[in-house]
Amino acid sequence: MASPAVPANVPPATAAAAPAPVVTAAPASAPTPSTPAPTPAATPAASPAPVSSDPAVAAPAAPGQTPASAPAPAQTPAPSQPGPALPGPFPGGRVVRLHPVILASIVDSYERRNEGAARVIGTLLGTVDKHSVEVTNCFSVPHNESEDEVAVDMEFAKNMYELHKKVSPNELILGWYATGHDITEHSVLIHEYYSREAPNPIHLTVDTGLQHGRMSIKAYVSTLMGVPGRTMGVMFTPLTVKYAYYDTERIGVDLIMKTCFSPNRVIGLSSDLQQVGGASARIQDALSTVLQYAEDVLSGKVSADNTVGRFLMSLVNQVPKIVPDDFETMLNSNINDLLMVTYLANLTQSQIALNEKLVNL
């Protein structure tokens, strides 16, 4: 990701907000004999970025960033990272699945933004399958915006992606995110740069300002529109956004949701015994619901559902048949193993603490 940001001298024409597609005109550049016609967001590797012709607009970027008005050092951008990317335009029904860590990271980066920054942007990472795009990670990218230009630290983004690949080599660049409830002319420029890293990238918007009383989360992909041979525009088409989570993420989300009922918005971590007790209570409530449903079906109060019946039968068949005496023996053996591991862990901790005190004497 080595392409610099470019100025936006001609503001795009933006249509109505989502769920209708958002239409944005591509940025215009000074006419020169060697400048090709504007291209869609998924720019070929040989197309140079447009450059502003007004020297008064060019302003120095922050340290480590590439000024928006500077032309690319090489006319051919860096090649995309290898690996399966988004296979062309999104087919109908393509779904974007977001994990809770994405939203938490975006909100955290917005709260820690530099003074005076209107919004924050970042890179989305994840995986792709035939029916959905799963966004599992992200990181923020420093940038500066003004009315005339935008400067993005693409070198920082490249280095961060290389570090993420060492931990999660299967995660690919899927697109980028931005805080706010609308799409600006700068969004078109930034989206064009990410199209060089991933075909048909996703643009995720998170309304951290709560314009309508809630955090609106929307995802878009861009498509080219316009008359051939004329100034082309970019249309941002909304996608379906769903939320997915692993079991460990679900535990954290459930714990965070409990703070809604706390007066000071703070809740302490429960002990292992309390967690086991809470899980047992939830299982008991679920079994009570199943038994009540079965009794209502047998009594004729509720019509039978074959799908529910097959699901319950599958659950019953998965329960192993164990003799009560054998189950008690297995449980006691596991408890003894757990107590032994706990004892050894505490003994090791005490030995380490004693060793540190002896070293400091």
UniProtKB/Swiss-Prot annotation:
Keyword Cytoplasm in record: yes
Domain MPN: 96-226
UniProt keyword Coiled coil present: no
N6-acetyllysine: modified positions: K242
Keywords: Acetylation, Cytoplasm, Hydrolase, Initiation factor, Phosphoprotein, Protease, Protein biosynthesis, Thiol protease, Ubl conjugation pathway
Its EC number(s): 3.4.19.12
Molecular function as annotated in GO: cysteine-type deubiquitinase activity; identical protein binding; metal-dependent deubiquitinase activity; translation initiation factor activity; translation initiation factor binding
Matches recorded under PROSITE patterns: MPN
Function of the protein: Component of the eukaryotic translation initiation factor 3 (eIF-3) complex, which is required for several steps in the initiation of protein synthesis. The eIF-3 complex associates with the 40S ribosome and facilitates the recruitment of eIF-1, eIF-1A, eIF-2:GTP:methionyl-tRNAi and eIF-5 to form the 43S pre-initiation complex (43S PIC). The eIF-3 complex stimulates mRNA recruitment to the 43S PIC and scanning of the mRNA for AUG recognition.
Name recorded for this polypeptide: Eukaryotic translation initiation factor 3 subunit F
Source organism phylogeny: Eukaryota, Metazoa, Chordata, Craniata, Vertebrata
